[in-house]
Amino acid sequence: MRRRDILRGSGVGLATLGLAQKTTARSECASAGAQTATLVLVHGTWHGGWVWQDVATGLRAMGHRVYTPTCTGCGERVHLTGPDVGLDTHITDIAQVLEFEDLNNVILVGHSFSGITITGVADRCRERIDRIVFFDALVPREGR
């Protein structure tokens, strides 16, 4: 099985992140006007936002707002890679999505290397983040 197929089928994995319980409660209250979750799903190395397509489709069908940006130098934006593109660029990419879309109470999900990216985004945009989720991702340690 290819890596992209594994991640595309990971919608079940996201349910284990606590969204299933929250979704059930929100689905029951949907007719009462309850808000749904806002998620920003950040891809790992060698991928692009497209890797979340099936997961995002499922979450949107449940009424959630889902964003799947592609970081500079990755996926369909690989042509933008260069010596100045790095972690800070990726943090800025995602932070700009939050700012330009005026997103608040965001559940920020990172896969693989983007665990480091979402940590930087959470530090930079802490007032916009509800929580961060490390989905089979690198988790930075204090002092390293």
What do these predicted ranges mean?
Residues 133-144:
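Flexible "cap/lid" loop of the alpha/beta hydrolase fold
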Residues 42-45, 112, 137:
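Glycine-rich His-Gly loop
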Residues 54, 120-124:
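Active-site signature of alpha/beta-hydrolase-fold catalytic machinery across serine-
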Residues 37-76:
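Conserved HGGG/HGGXW glycine-rich cap/lid loop of the alpha/beta-hydrolase fold
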Residues 107, 131-133:
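Residue in the alpha/beta-hydrolase core beta-strand immediately N-terminal to the catalytic nucleophile
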Residues 110, 114, 118:
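Gly/Ala-rich beta-loop-alpha elbow adjacent to hydrolase catalytic centers
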Residues 65, 71-107, 123-124:
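Active-site loop/oxyanion-hole signature of alpha/beta-hydrolase fold enzymes
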Residues 5-26:
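N-terminal export signals
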